Amino acid sequence: MTDILNKILATKAQEVAAQKAAVNAEHIRTLAAEAAPVRSFIDSIRGKHRLNLPAVIAEIKKASPSKGLIRPDFRPAEIARAYENAGAACLSVLTDEPYFQGSPEYLKQAREAVSLPVLRKDFIIDEYQVYQARAWGADAVLLIAAALEQEQLERFEAVAHELGMTVLLELHDETELEKCRNLTTPLWGVNNRNLRTFEVSLDQTLSLLPALEGKTVVTESGITGKADVEFMQSRGVHTFLIGETFMRADDIEAEVGKLF
């Protein structure tokens, strides 16, 4: 595990402890059960594929540790509508505040503005956060293999599935495959950003493709132009999680159109 990831996870542990003190586990479960019905994240992706279209998971992200502030003029509902108009399959919304300037309010605002399913993009380290995601209205959660042990991955996935949510499992390299072997989610993402160097290479996705046969593979990070999209499609990857490229655009809807 890298220094930056260790730092983020340590902060997250403190954050979750404070959240549990404010809203106990029993109450967050009740809120999750009372949340608006789930929109199927995986079905939305498969719907695009059935039409022979790429499935875009369009990200709403204000900032990141590596790039700092990405989009000063940040209006989640407006961004969500632009993504929906452009034909995105799903949304991804950052809810981590210390490192990504995210917020649960951004997730709620985005989801209320559109009919698309929404992923809570955060560092999940406790099953409490899975219930919390559903309580906030999320339809899917991200589980990062590098941040979790096998038992945690399996337990958090089970909770998410019990709540009707889709799990996007995120891998960085082949060393993480073994602890994920029992997971049943069909949606496996590969983050092209090296956690140690922060360098980005689409080879990360390509190197893992043989091991992910039969999965719906999502390529994450590093897609900056139409050539990248066409290259990944030529290799059999048809699902893309893209944030920064869209967030830096003056006209988000037009930028999505340029790539897809």
From Swiss-Prot:
It catalyses: 1-(2-carboxyphenylamino)-1-deoxy-D-ribulose 5-phosphate + H(+) = (1S,2R)-1-C-(indol-3-yl)glycerol 3-phosphate + CO2 + H2O. Keywords: Amino-acid biosynthesis, Aromatic amino acid biosynthesis, Decarboxylase, Lyase, Tryptophan biosynthesis. It comes from the Bacteria. Its EC number is 4.1.1.48. SUPFAM superfamilies: Ribulose-phoshate binding barrel (SSF51366). CDD domains: IGPS. It is an enzyme of class 4 (lyase). The keyword Lyase applies. Pathway: Amino-acid biosynthesis; L-tryptophan biosynthesis; L-tryptophan from chorismate: step 4/5. PROSITE patterns: IGPS. One of its GO terms (molecular function) is indole-3-glycerol-phosphate synthase activity. InterPro entries: Aldolase_TIM, Indole-3-glycerol_P_synth, Indole-3-glycerol_P_synth_dom, Indole-3-GlycerolPSynthase_CS, RibuloseP-bd_barrel. GO terms for biological process: L-tryptophan biosynthetic process. The keyword Lyase applies. Belongs to the TrpC family. This is Indole-3-glycerol phosphate synthase. The gene is trpC.
